[in-house]
Every structure is written in C-alpha cells, then in structure tokens.
C-alpha cells in the first residue's frame, strides 16, 4: 500500500510512474476525485461544527437573558443534521478510498527499467556455459517418466492436471535439494530457519498484497475462510504483522521451506507438461525485514544468495532486471533469475527477488523504532525464491542427462543422496 501523503502531495508524479507500469489509471483518477471531495467535506464539516458551537453559545446566552431561543435552536438542528449527512458521506468516501488504495500497485524505483512488456526486461549478467549436446536431449517430463522418478499420469488420476508424484530417487533428489538449500541459507547466508503454516487468513493475504486484487489466483478453503499459501512469503512476512521491531534487531532474515499452491488462473495452455507450472510445488523462500536506507543493498545480497544455489549446482543462468510493465503488483524493483532449460531452448524463471520498500509493511503494519521512545517507522520488506524446487529438478534432469538416458547428480548434492552419483534407467 502506498503512502496516502505521497499520493496527495505528488499526484502527477505517481500517476506518471503508474503509467510507466502500463496500469489502467481509472481507479487512480477516481482516488484523486474522491480525495478532493473528501477534503472539501472536511472543510465544510469543520466550518459547520464551528458554527454549531457558536450557535450553542448564543442559545445559552439567550436562555440566560430569558429571550426566545427557538430560531437558534432550529438553526442548530439544521446544522447538526447537515453534519450527520456529511459524516456519513465522509465514512463512505473513506471506505472507497481504502479499497482503491489497496488496488493501486507499488511505484517503480528509479532504477527499474521503463518498458511495455517482458521484451523490455534488461539482462544484467549471465553465469555458466550452456551445454552443447552430441545427442538429442530429452525433456525432463520424458526423462522423469523413463527413469521412473516422476509420475504425472497417476497424479492426474488422483488429483488432476498440473500435479506430480515424485518417486524413488526423484523424491530423494527433491529432498536433497531442500536440505542443501536450507543448509546453505541458514549456515552460510545468515538466515533464520522457519517451517510455516500452509494456510493463512485474509489479513495475511492482504498484508503481502495477494488480496483483494488477486483472489482468483489463490485456493480458498471456504468453510474456514483460509487460503492455501501461494508462497512462504505470505506467512513469514506476516509473522511480524502489527509488530514494532527494535532497530538493533534489523535486519531480520528468514528462510522457509514450504509447499506452494497456485490456481494458475490465466495460464491455460501454457507449460501444460512437466514441472514448470504446477498447482502444487515446493519452494525455499528468503524473506528480509530491513531499515529503509539498507533495502537496496539488501536486495543485491539477497539476489546473490539465490544465485549461489545455481552456481553450486553448476546450472547456467542469467539475471534480469524486470521492467516497469513486468514488475508485479507489490515490487518497487525486481530481479528474475532464469535457468537454462534445454527442452525450451531458453532460460526460464526459477527465482524472483524483490524489494517492496514499505508497500507490504504499510498493509501489514510492520514497523521499527530507531531509538526507544522514537516514532515508529515502516520497515522495508524483501523476498526471493531460493529456489523453486520443481524447476530446479527440471533443470538438473535436462542439463545433467547423458546419451544413455541416465542423469548425473550434481556434486554438491551427492552427499545429501548417500553418495549416489547417477540416476539410471530401471533394468
């Protein structure tokens, strides 16, 4: 949520930045109109209240002097009725303004590239060499099926499309990746480990920006009015909802493993095969709470923490700075990490690392005090995937495959898999 004062005092500047996002400005313009009406009503209400006080004093004086006060009493009644009417309108406008404010996205940071589509995202760097195969490489869904480690068919029978069973060494590979990532982030990168709830309430989904605008993308348990989490970012960020943190306790850095649940509304026909776009997938998340002046340096470090996973797995990747049109609702600046997937002959997103500045903190009321007794300020929140597990498995299967249909295990994972070096075709 944006600062209301920023909207009121810098309306045209904010409007331009939202235009750079490609946003429909209808709601934003409505905010300006309603806020103007609100200020007019406040001025009128204050004037009427002042008038009511004056009339009340005049009535008291007339009564003390034994004079007729009926006309003044009627005047005060009319003024009082008008104040009640204006107060009702003010409450209605405040409710509308709150709803609109919740629907306005974050404004891009000045370093975010201005663009009209994903084609305008800017490549920052690449790492690793894309492998040249001397045989026809298989897609990960075929590799997983042939190796008997991924079962999409029975998952579709048990649940539906966009689900998978991990089996045998496939399940062990995923578990190895989880442990490797959590160990790396907690032991070397300084994150505190968490295992969060997989269901959250509406206040939590609102705090991180999924609600009210993107409810159709979420899975709702109607009987309880709980949502299955789309990412561990939601429960972990809301862990500090309504908190006032101490400055000396910042930054707070958390890493959390969780299952994630997404309806993928609007994704019909896209990535229908394999692990790239599932309704349920596992992910290791990175979340930080920092002082405002530290957030952009923190974003670079957080992005580097996610990159380190790919480097140790020796998977080729690139980093993109996302343009204004591809920034997402909550971010002021965002980097995407894309890993090379041979079956797509392209890089595919495996992590997003974002600085939300105070956008989420305002919605969730997460603040800190610089000194005891000082006025609380909003923290800046950041998060990143460190990494998405399904896409990491897909990248390993495809990049580490051999001509005989087997898949080598990255060296960094072999210790987590009991020394197993290769997944071979069943005999």
From Swiss-Prot:
<keyword id="KW-0963">Cytoplasm</keyword>
<dbReference type="GO" id="GO:0140096">
    <property type="term" value="F:catalytic activity, acting on a protein"/>
</dbReference>
<keyword id="KW-0547">Nucleotide-binding</keyword>
<keyword id="KW-0648">Protein biosynthesis</keyword>
<dbReference type="InterPro" id="IPR045864">
    <property type="entry name" value="aa-tRNA-synth_II/BPL/LPL"/>
</dbReference>
<dbReference type="GO" id="GO:0005524">
    <property type="term" value="F:ATP binding"/>
</dbReference>
<comment type="similarity">
    <text>Belongs to the class-II aminoacyl-tRNA synthetase family. Type-1 seryl-tRNA synthetase subfamily.</text>
</comment>
<comment type="subunit">
    <text>Homodimer. The tRNA molecule binds across the dimer.</text>
</comment>
<comment type="function">
    <text>Catalyzes the attachment of serine to tRNA(Ser). Is also able to aminoacylate tRNA(Sec) with serine, to form the misacylated tRNA L-seryl-tRNA(Sec), which will be further converted into selenocysteinyl-tRNA(Sec).</text>
</comment>
<dbReference type="InterPro" id="IPR006195">
    <property type="entry name" value="aa-tRNA-synth_II"/>
</dbReference>
<dbReference type="GO" id="GO:0016740">
    <property type="term" value="F:transferase activity"/>
</dbReference>
<dbReference type="InterPro" id="IPR010978">
    <property type="entry name" value="tRNA-bd_arm"/>
</dbReference>
<keyword id="KW-0030">Aminoacyl-tRNA synthetase</keyword>
<dbReference type="InterPro" id="IPR042103">
    <property type="entry name" value="SerRS_1_N_sf"/>
</dbReference>
<feature type="binding site">
    <location>
        <begin position="231"/>
        <end position="233"/>
    </location>
    <ligand>
        <name>L-serine</name>
    </ligand>
</feature>
<feature type="binding site">
    <location>
        <position position="385"/>
    </location>
    <ligand>
        <name>L-serine</name>
    </ligand>
</feature>
<dbReference type="InterPro" id="IPR033729">
    <property type="entry name" value="SerRS_core"/>
</dbReference>
<dbReference type="InterPro" id="IPR002317">
    <property type="entry name" value="Ser-tRNA-ligase_type_1"/>
</dbReference>
<dbReference type="Pfam" id="PF02403">
    <property type="entry name" value="Seryl_tRNA_N"/>
</dbReference>
<dbReference type="InterPro" id="IPR015866">
    <property type="entry name" value="Ser-tRNA-synth_1_N"/>
</dbReference>
<feature type="binding site">
    <location>
        <begin position="349"/>
        <end position="352"/>
    </location>
    <ligand>
        <name>ATP</name>
    </ligand>
</feature>
<dbReference type="Pfam" id="PF00587">
    <property type="entry name" value="tRNA-synt_2b"/>
</dbReference>
<dbReference type="GO" id="GO:0016260">
    <property type="term" value="P:selenocysteine biosynthetic process"/>
</dbReference>
<feature type="binding site">
    <location>
        <begin position="262"/>
        <end position="264"/>
    </location>
    <ligand>
        <name>ATP</name>
    </ligand>
</feature>
<dbReference type="GO" id="GO:0005737">
    <property type="term" value="C:cytoplasm"/>
</dbReference>
<feature type="binding site">
    <location>
        <position position="285"/>
    </location>
    <ligand>
        <name>L-serine</name>
    </ligand>
</feature>
<protein>
    <recommendedName>
        <fullName>Serine--tRNA ligase</fullName>
        <ecNumber>6.1.1.11</ecNumber>
    </recommendedName>
</protein>
<keyword id="KW-0067">ATP-binding</keyword>
<dbReference type="GO" id="GO:0004828">
    <property type="term" value="F:serine-tRNA ligase activity"/>
</dbReference>
<comment type="pathway">
    <text>Aminoacyl-tRNA biosynthesis; selenocysteinyl-tRNA(Sec) biosynthesis; L-seryl-tRNA(Sec) from L-serine and tRNA(Sec): step 1/1.</text>
</comment>
<dbReference type="GO" id="GO:0006434">
    <property type="term" value="P:seryl-tRNA aminoacylation"/>
</dbReference>
<keyword id="KW-0436">Ligase</keyword>
<dbReference type="InterPro" id="IPR002314">
    <property type="entry name" value="aa-tRNA-synt_IIb"/>
</dbReference>
């Amino acid at each position: 949520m944006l600062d209301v004062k920023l909207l009121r005092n810098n309306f045209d500047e904010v409007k331009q930045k939202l235009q750079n996002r490609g946003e429909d400005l209808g709601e934003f313009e409505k905010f300006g109109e309603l806020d103007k009406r609100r200020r007019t009503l406040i001025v009128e209400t204050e004037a009427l209240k002042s008038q009511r006080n004056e009339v009340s004093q005049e009535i008291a004086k007339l009564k003390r002097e034994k004079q007729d006060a009926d006309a003044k009493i009627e005047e005060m009644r009319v003024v009082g009725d008008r104040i009640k009417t204006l107060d009702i309108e003010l409450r209605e406008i405040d409710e509308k303004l709150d709803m609109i404010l919740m629907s306005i996205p974050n404004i891009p940071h000045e370093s975010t590239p201005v663009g009209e589509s994903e084609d305008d995202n800017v490549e920052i760097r690449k790492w690793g060499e894309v492998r040249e195969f001397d045989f026809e490489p298989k897609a990960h869904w075929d590799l997983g099926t042939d190796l008997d480690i991924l079962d999409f068919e029975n998952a579709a029978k048990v649940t539906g499309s966009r689900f998978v069973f991990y089996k045998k060494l496939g399940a062990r590979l995923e578990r190895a990746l989880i442990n490797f990532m959590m160990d790396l982030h907690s032991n070397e990168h300084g994150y505190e480990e968490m295992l969060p709830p997989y269901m959250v309430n509406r206040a939590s989904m609102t705090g991180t920006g999924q609600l009210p605008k993107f409810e159709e993308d979420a899975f709702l348990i109607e009987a309880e009015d709980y949502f299955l989490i789309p990412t561990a970012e939601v429960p972990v960020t809301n862990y500090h909802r309504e908190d006032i943190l101490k400055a000396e306790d910042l930054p707070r850095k958390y890493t959390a493993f969780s299952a994630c649940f997404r309806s993928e509304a609007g994704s019909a026909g896209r990535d229908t095969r394999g692990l790239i776009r599932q309704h349920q997938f596992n992910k290791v998340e990175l979340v930080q709470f920092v002082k405002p002046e530290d957030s952009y340096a923190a974003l670079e470090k957080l992005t580097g923490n996610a990159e380190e996973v790919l480097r140790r797995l020796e998977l080729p990747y690139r980093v993109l700075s996302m343009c204004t049109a591809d920034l997402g609702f909550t971010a002021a600046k965002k980097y995407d990490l894309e890993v090379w997937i041979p079956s797509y002959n392209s890089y595919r997103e495996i992590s997003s690392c974002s600085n939300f500045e105070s956008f989420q903190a305002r919605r969730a009321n997460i603040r800190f005090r610089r000194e005891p007794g000082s006025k609380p300020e909003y923290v800046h929140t950041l998060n990143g995937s460190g990494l998405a597990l399904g896409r990491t498995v897909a990248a390993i299967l495809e990049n580490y495959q051999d001509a005989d249909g087997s898949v080598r295990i990255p060296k960094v994972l072999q210790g987590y898999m009991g020394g197993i070096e290769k997944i071979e075709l069943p005999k």
